[in-house]
Amino acid sequence: MINVTALAFAISHVTDVARARKFYEGTLGLKVCMDMEFAPGKWWIEYDAGGPSALAITNFESPNTNTAPSPGVALEVSNYDEALAAVRAAGIAITWGPNEFSLCHCFAVKDPDGNDLYFHRRKPAA
């Protein structure tokens, strides 16, 4: 059984990072809680959305698929390895990952309607 503990983040794809940052940080006053450049000019920025949740914006495109992470939600799970095993045992295709980053682990699947659903686990120091 997958143990979901919170909504980890929601993702919005942006085409102009500077314009998006001006809007989210300047206009809306959101505070940056993570700012990572995956590759030159390819950004993943998370804004504090209260509690363990964040709003992520990105212009990142996967080098394997030339597609950006699609808008979607990420579920924070307390049992990441078990969640990954449960998804695989159910025959659900992993569409992104599994990935290990400095602050977290994450993978994605498609729901029955083709929406991206991410499973996420923050590392203890995060």
List the model feature ranges, each with a label.
Residues I2-T5, I11-S53:
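Core segments of cupin and vicinal oxygen chelate
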